[in-house]
Structures are given as structure tokens and as C-alpha cells.
């Protein structure tokens, strides 16, 4: 069966995937796979923009949010009409049959990922279909994947993605294994701590200062040196409490930092 993979590190936020999805499904009736997607209010694939940090250290990451086409789909379990939601054996795509859906909304409420929408005008639930109608006509991949210029988003056989899946991350990691999600990510945004060290007396940045970041409880320690601009940065940090220590010769400074959010410490005087 097929899986979707997305490498956040090479996604440039072009929105081609989101636009291609709209182009394929708005005003187009692909019954029995899907009725038309509304112009507004629904994004069967929504590109999430994650902005974090504080000026001047701001990072932006993009990743698609779509149906996970779960092997143990909560929506299928919640559906009250036999066969209205089914999983295709040949590719693993989960489909809401628009000819059988009665509009009870049970699947909308059951989806823990918030990716099933309700079409008030048509009185039916709708979501990503993986462009199953195109695959059935000979396409190798959905429109969103076909439109991705950086190959960040792929639709491949599960066996081909074994190495990717082994290191994969998930938007809801606590549910991924239980639901058997078939959308796998790598390099999802994590916390960072950054700053610029300077000497207030010399009025110059401090180059080559030793910067150590110690997790509370001594679980892990990270180290770095300030660069030619006096900058340092620690990336891919877990959420937690840390002690940041900066040393240069006899001068030192200690700062308590929490990664409940990304932290840009700005200019740090070393005295």
C-alpha cells in the first residue's frame, strides 16, 4: 500500500500542493470518490505555516495537514452507515462515499486530526481522497504530490519509504501507532535558543565564546561557540528547562531558559 511522506526541511512554502488540491476538486464532481469541494471553508490539504522565534531570529516552516488515511481510522469506526467510509486495499486510501454518506457528522466529530469537513450545502462529510479518481485513471500520484517542485511531498509504496518511516515524526505522536497513520513527516519544527554575545566595554561582539546549554536534571548538555558575528544557536531542542552558560576567559554569564516556546535572547552583554 501507499504512504505520503513529507520532509519539512525542503518545503519552501510555495503552496502549490494546496492550490493543486483546490484546482482538482473545486467545481469538479468525482463521484463516487468525491463531490465538489466548496470554494471556501475547506482545505482537504492545508499547508500549515509555523512561525516561531522573535525578531531578529525568526524561523518559518511549512508542512501539509491532510487526512492520514489511517489503517485503524476512527472515522470508519464512528460511521453509522455500512460502507459509507471504506479503505481501498490497493493503495490504502480512506474514502467517504458521497453516495452513501447521510450527513450524520459522526466521522467529523471522531477525527482526532480535524481533517474531515462538513459540506452544509450537500449535507455530507468531505476530506482528502488522495485523488483516488486520478490514480484509477492511470496517474502515479495525487495532484498535490505532482505539483511539489522540491519533492518534499511524495506518494510512494510503503516498502520504498522504510528508511524514511523509521525516522518519521507525527503531528499527533501519541496517536500515530494506534491509528496507523499513513502520512509520515521528517524535520517537524522543534525548539531553538539563539542569541548574540557582546562586550559592553569594548562595544564589540565576542567571537569564540564557549556556550553551554544544560538540560534540567543533567539529562543532556549541548555546546557551541559564538561565530564571527558573536552569534550562537541551539536547534532541535525538546520542551523543557535549561541553564545557558556563556564563558570567555574570566568572564561568564548564566541564564535560565525555558523552551516552552522558541527563544531569541537578543544581545547578551558579557561582563
Model feature map: region roles:
Residues 16-34, 72-99, 106-123, 140-161:
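Iron-sulfur cluster-binding cysteine motifs and their immediate structural context
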Residues 217-231:
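Short, acidic Ser/Thr/Gly-rich low-complexity loop/linker segments typical of extracellular
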Residues 191-193, 200-217:
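Short, ordered, surface-exposed loop/turn motifs in non-cytosolic proteins
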Amino acid at each position: 500500500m501507499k504512504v505520503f511522506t513529507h520532509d519539512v526541511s525542503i518545503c519552501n512554502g510555495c503552496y502549490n500542493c494546496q492550490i493543486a488540491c483546490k484546482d482538482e476538486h473545486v467545481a469538479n464532481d468525482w463521484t463516487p470518490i468525491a463531490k465538489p469541494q466548496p470554494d471556501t471553508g475547506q482545505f482537504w490539504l492545508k499547508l500549515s505555516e509555523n512561525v516561531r522565534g522573535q525578531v531578529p531570529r525568526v524561523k518559518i516552516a511549512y508542512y501539509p495537514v491532510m487526512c492520514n488515511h489511517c489503517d485503524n481510522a476512527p472515522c470508519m469506526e464512528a460511521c453509522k452507515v455500512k460502507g459509507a467510509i471504506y479503505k481501498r486495499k490497493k493503495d490504502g486510501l480512506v474514502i467517504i462515499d458521497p453516495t452513501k454518506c447521510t450527513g450524520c457528522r459522526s466521522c467529523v466529530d471522531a477525527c482526532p486530526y480535524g481533517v474531515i469537513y462538513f459540506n452544509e450545502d450537500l449535507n455530507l462529510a468531505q476530506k482528502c481522497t488522495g485523488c483516488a479518481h486520478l490514480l484509477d485513471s492511470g496517474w502515479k500520484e495525487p495532484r498535490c504530490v505532482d505539483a511539489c517542485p522540491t519533492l518534499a511531498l511524495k506518494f510512494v509504496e510503503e516498502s520504498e519509504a522504510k528508511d524514511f518511516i523509521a525516522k518519521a515524526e507525527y503531528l499527533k505522536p501519541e496517536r500515530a501507532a494506534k491509528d496507523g497513520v499513513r502520512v509520515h513527516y521528517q524535520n517537524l519544527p522543534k525548539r531553538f535558543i539563539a542569541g548574540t554575545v557582546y562586550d559592553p566595554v569594548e562595544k564589540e561582539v565576542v567571537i569564540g565564546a564557549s556556550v553551554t546549554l544544560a538540560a534540567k536534571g543533567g539529562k543532556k548538555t549541548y555546546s557551541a561557540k559564538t561565530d564571527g558575528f558573536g552569534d550562537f544557536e541551539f536547534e532541535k531542542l525538546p520542551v523543557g528547562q535549561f541553564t545557558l552558560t556563556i564563558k570567555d576567559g574570566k568572564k561568564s554569564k548564566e541564564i535560565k531558559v525555558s523552551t516552552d516556546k522558541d527563544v531569541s535572547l537578543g544581545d547578551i552583554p558579557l561582563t
